[in-house]
Amino acid sequence: MNLRLAVFDLDGVIVSTDMFHFEAWKRLFAKRWGIVHTPAAEELTKGVARFECMKLLAHYYDIHADDEELRLAAEEKNKIYQQLLMEQLSPSNILPGILQTLALLKERGVYTALASSSRNAPFIIKRLGLEFDYCVDPATISHGKPAPDIYLAAMNHFGVSAQECV
C-alpha cells in the first residue's frame, strides 16, 4: 500500500476535550434548570452533535422544552465551552504520540487532514499550534458522522483513493 493521506478526527484522537464539554454541560444545567449533570448522562453525548446532545440530555433529565429553547441552550453551552477552551486549553491536552505521528507523516510526505464534525475544531488546532494539510469544513458536509461524507471530502480534496488512506 502506498500511503498518501492520513485522516484524523479531533476529539479523542488528537486532543482530549471531554473535561471541557462536561464542565460546560454541568454549568449550563445548573444555571438553567438547577440540575446536577452527571458522568452517566455525559456518556450519552460522546460523538453526538451539539443540538442532538441537548435533545438527548433534555430527555434524560425530563426537561420539557421546545426545540427553540433547546437550541438556545445548546448555543449557550457552546459559549461556555469556548470560554473554558480560551481559559484552560493547552498543549497538555494533546494526546500522547500525536505530535510525533504528525511529524513522521510530514517527513514521509504523507498528507494530513482533519475530519472533525466540531465547528470549534479550527480554534482548537490553532490554539494548540497544530497544522494539517487540509481541514474539512463540517458545514460543507451533507451527512454527518457516522456517514463517510467527511472522510470522502478529505480524500477528494487530495484526489486519493480509499486504498491510499488511513
Language-model features: where?
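Substrate-recognition element of Asp-dependent hydrolases with the DxDx(T/V) motif
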Residues: 98-127
